[in-house]
Amino acid sequence: MSKLADLRQEYARAELSRDHVTDDPIEQFRAWFDEAEDAELEEPNAMTLATAATDGTPSARIVLLKGLDDRGFHFYTNYESRKGTDLSQNPHAALVFLWKPLERQVRIEGTVERLPAEESTEYFHRRPRGAQMGAWASPQSRVVDSRADLEENLDTVKAEYGDEDEIPRPSHWGGYVVRPTEVEFWQGRPNRLHDRLRYRRSDPAGDWTLERLAP
């Protein structure tokens, strides 16, 4: 820990200019994501999700991107978790993707909506069976006395659904879509003069403005 102030890395892998990007940030994200996959990065769909309660108290955690379309960025969780509670009170969020070997970040801000129930159900049934049971067994973000309590909950779920061909989706579990109003692409550059290109719009249905930000 004594060397924290001396930890640094020079970035010189690539550059980013207006000539390098598309007019649509969703398409630009897809292009960068494909490059992250081609580079065989571990879990390139891992992203920081930041939410805030109505009093402004923030919270952040790593979740996985599980879908992307013209509406925005999809993830799934327990609606009664800390993030679910935050989003029910304050439907705004920020996402950050870090692809360190490529010296890249993508930062997203936007409004958040629940995905339609049928989409959540379809994705739920594509999950491993154990993960489906876990969604029933875990009272996410609540205090539990011990790990044994969780295992007991799981045993109860197995007893109820173990012989069923299909486990129903819990009503407290499902998907969200972050509808972006701002998307920033960051490329590391020498001397900390990084490239930052930001797309922004005033509402999720508006036109995009592209601008360069100082690092």
Curated annotation (Swiss-Prot):
<protein>
    <recommendedName>
        <fullName>Pyridoxine/pyridoxamine 5'-phosphate oxidase</fullName>
        <ecNumber>1.4.3.5</ecNumber>
    </recommendedName>
</protein>
<feature type="binding site">
    <location>
        <position position="66"/>
    </location>
    <ligand>
        <name>substrate</name>
    </ligand>
</feature>
<keyword id="KW-0560">Oxidoreductase</keyword>
<feature type="binding site">
    <location>
        <position position="123"/>
    </location>
    <ligand>
        <name>substrate</name>
    </ligand>
</feature>
<dbReference type="GO" id="GO:0004733">
    <property type="term" value="F:pyridoxamine phosphate oxidase activity"/>
</dbReference>
<feature type="binding site">
    <location>
        <position position="82"/>
    </location>
    <ligand>
        <name>FMN</name>
    </ligand>
</feature>
<comment type="subunit">
    <text>Homodimer.</text>
</comment>
<dbReference type="InterPro" id="IPR000659">
    <property type="entry name" value="Pyridox_Oxase"/>
</dbReference>
<feature type="binding site">
    <location>
        <position position="105"/>
    </location>
    <ligand>
        <name>FMN</name>
    </ligand>
</feature>
<keyword id="KW-0664">Pyridoxine biosynthesis</keyword>
<comment type="pathway">
    <text>Cofactor metabolism; pyridoxal 5'-phosphate salvage; pyridoxal 5'-phosphate from pyridoxamine 5'-phosphate: step 1/1.</text>
</comment>
<dbReference type="InterPro" id="IPR019576">
    <property type="entry name" value="Pyridoxamine_oxidase_dimer_C"/>
</dbReference>
<dbReference type="InterPro" id="IPR011576">
    <property type="entry name" value="Pyridox_Oxase_N"/>
</dbReference>
<comment type="function">
    <text>Catalyzes the oxidation of either pyridoxine 5'-phosphate (PNP) or pyridoxamine 5'-phosphate (PMP) into pyridoxal 5'-phosphate (PLP).</text>
</comment>
<dbReference type="InterPro" id="IPR019740">
    <property type="entry name" value="Pyridox_Oxase_CS"/>
</dbReference>
<dbReference type="Pfam" id="PF01243">
    <property type="entry name" value="PNPOx_N"/>
</dbReference>
<dbReference type="GO" id="GO:0010181">
    <property type="term" value="F:FMN binding"/>
</dbReference>
<feature type="binding site">
    <location>
        <position position="83"/>
    </location>
    <ligand>
        <name>FMN</name>
    </ligand>
</feature>
<feature type="binding site">
    <location>
        <begin position="8"/>
        <end position="11"/>
    </location>
    <ligand>
        <name>substrate</name>
    </ligand>
</feature>
<feature type="binding site">
    <location>
        <begin position="61"/>
        <end position="66"/>
    </location>
    <ligand>
        <name>FMN</name>
    </ligand>
</feature>
<feature type="binding site">
    <location>
        <position position="196"/>
    </location>
    <ligand>
        <name>FMN</name>
    </ligand>
</feature>
<keyword id="KW-0288">FMN</keyword>
<comment type="similarity">
    <text>Belongs to the pyridoxamine 5'-phosphate oxidase family.</text>
</comment>
<dbReference type="InterPro" id="IPR012349">
    <property type="entry name" value="Split_barrel_FMN-bd"/>
</dbReference>
<feature type="binding site">
    <location>
        <begin position="76"/>
        <end position="77"/>
    </location>
    <ligand>
        <name>FMN</name>
    </ligand>
</feature>
<dbReference type="Pfam" id="PF10590">
    <property type="entry name" value="PNP_phzG_C"/>
</dbReference>
<feature type="binding site">
    <location>
        <position position="127"/>
    </location>
    <ligand>
        <name>substrate</name>
    </ligand>
</feature>
<keyword id="KW-0285">Flavoprotein</keyword>
<feature type="binding site">
    <location>
        <position position="186"/>
    </location>
    <ligand>
        <name>FMN</name>
    </ligand>
</feature>
<feature type="binding site">
    <location>
        <begin position="192"/>
        <end position="194"/>
    </location>
    <ligand>
        <name>substrate</name>
    </ligand>
</feature>
<comment type="pathway">
    <text>Cofactor metabolism; pyridoxal 5'-phosphate salvage; pyridoxal 5'-phosphate from pyridoxine 5'-phosphate: step 1/1.</text>
</comment>
<feature type="binding site">
    <location>
        <begin position="140"/>
        <end position="141"/>
    </location>
    <ligand>
        <name>FMN</name>
    </ligand>
</feature>
<dbReference type="GO" id="GO:0008615">
    <property type="term" value="P:pyridoxine biosynthetic process"/>
</dbReference>
